[in-house]
Amino acid sequence: MMMDILMYLFETYIHSDADLQVDQDELEDELLRAGFHQQDIYKALLWLEELAALQQSDAHSAISRCSAVSSTRVYSPKEMQRLDIECRGFLLFLEQINVLTTETREMVIDRVMGLETNEFELEDLKWIILMVLFNVPGNENAYTLMEELLYTKEQGILH
């Protein structure tokens, strides 16, 4: 349910260029009217606050200074449980085509692990990646490419 709220917020406010200066109480009321539960709303808003805090974190600038171009990400057992082989392969693919940097990949993994869900699929990962790229300044080209990857798959490719 938390993922549903995040996607709703992203599509309603961020992706549609709607007014981003929304009062949190107003937002909570709107989400309640849309049928979401108070506890899930709270968790989703906290998740978004944590995403915003990541871009100001010193830990992520340390990641970018320490990582070598040829380094390989080793996933913890907990991360592997959440991110199946298809998801991990997709993250690697996005790094190889320069949609994700080491830093943005780690932000994506952090936010994936911050979700409270038992079910997580590749489509969910794509939305999380889009949200992270949107929230990190300087990633406009990567965001556009990721958006194309997401929507091309959804609409089908015409030959």
Swiss-Prot record:
Residue intervals passing through the bilayer: none
Family annotation (PANTHER family): PROTEIN SMG
NCBIfam families reported for this sequence: PRK03430.1 (NF002897)
Family: Belongs to the Smg family.
HAMAP family associated with the record: Smg
The protein's name: Protein Smg homolog
